Structures are given as C-alpha cells and as structure tokens.
C-alpha cells in the first residue's frame, strides 16, 4: 500500500538546493528541527507527484501522521506549506461492514441491570470504558513491537456486557473516559497535575508525547480488534473518545485559552 502526495510549488527558490522534500509529521512532532529523515525528494515545480509506503515498519501504519513539503536551506529543512493528512483512511479498514442502525431508542446502560435495559426494547446502548483501568495484568498484547499488559478483570466485564447487548441486536457505543491514570501516567496530558474531583473529572488523552501516542494507539487497537463482532466477544458499533470535550471540567487539558484548547 502506498501514500500518494501531489505538490505544486513555485516562487523564488534561491538559497535552496532546488528540490522539494516530503516529511512525515507525527502527532507529537511540531517542526523539522534536527531532522533529515525525509520520505521523498523531487523537483520544485507544478504537479510534482510523490509516493511512499503506508507502513512505517512492521505493523505500524502512517494513518495518524501528517505530511509536509519542505526545502533545504543551508543545513536545515524548512516547511513551505501547512501539514496535510491522509484523506481516505477508511479504505484500509479491515472491517468494511455497514454500521448497525436498528432504531432510535437508546440508553446509557448500567452493566449490573442489563436485563432491565433490554426489557425496554432498546436499540442503542452506551457503554463506558474507564481507561484508567485498562492497563493492568492478565492479558499481554503486543502492538508495534511492544508488549502491553491489560487488565483482564475489566476486559472480562466488557466482554460480558458487549456480547450480551450485541447478541440482543443492540448497537453498542463505547465511550472512552480518561480519568487520572496512576498506572500509565503517559496517558495524562503533558504538564498537568491531578486536580480535585470538584475541578476535573476526566482528562484529555495525551498524544503530545511518543509514549502517550503509542499507548493510546495500542489501547484503541486492542479494543477495536476484540469487539469487531467476529471473535465471540460481541461488537462495538460506535466509538466516542472523551466526554464533553469542549468543557475543561469533563476533559481537562491544562491552562489553555479557548483558541488553544479547541
């Protein structure tokens, strides 16, 4: 599989080496400082086409990366346009089945009283996944060459809940809630300390560091594969990441103004 990029460049290229370079920018990267690892190189001009592998390494896709053109000035590379993301990531999805949409009636369910919810003939159910409990012990999961330890107690609970609902024809929506994480602190927003519950209940996910980004990806990969409806654990049809993300009480990210926060 390949990623294709088309670049139109013009203007004064004096001071450069006459070439345009394509760089990958990962979510935790902001600029090209000190970098020389460009993906492709071509001539400055109109309708220049580049391609490079979708896979960055074994099992590691570039789906979440952005790509920028740059020129070489002296010994450094400088971006010459805004970053762009892959515009059709859905074509590489393993599961191309249409989403389940059995009706309008739905509830955010309590796992202890599923019978009551099902007796109301619900068609949709919201299931909370507390991500501060996700990592733990009992299940080993290897993702992008790293093995993560996952809390089997939580997964057993989710297995029972999701399977019961989806086997009953209910479309399950999982809501990933990131309370302060003592087990895997890299999931907590950078530069933020835990606040009293009356000030913040949940926190935004940290994808500003490589460790946080990879932990979030590993968690998403495990959950998506386990609850794809094809391996006996039930199916999660929809995913909600965070809660009330425009409100710092429910999705705390630190001391930002509105513009920076959004």
Where are these regions (language model features)?
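Mature N-terminal, pre-catalytic/accessory segment of carbohydrate-active enzymes
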Residues: 1-112
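Beta-strand acidic-aromatic groove motif in beta-rich domains, primarily in extracellular
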Residues: 15-21, 174, 182-189
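Short helix-terminating capping/connector loops at secondary-structure junctions
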Residues: 100, 166-167, 231-236
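Catalytic domains of carbohydrate-active enzymes, especially glycoside hydrolases
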Residues: 104-138, 160-177
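Generic structural signal for well-ordered alpha-helices
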Residues: 113-115, 158-163, 220-224, 262
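Short, solvent-exposed loop/turn and secondary-structure capping segments
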Residues: 117-119, 136-137, 177, 183-189, ...
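Acidic/aromatic-lined carbohydrate-recognition and catalytic surfaces
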Residues: 130-154, 167, 171, 177-182, ...
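Active-site cleft segment of glycoside hydrolase catalytic domains centered on the general acid/base Glu
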Residues: 187-262
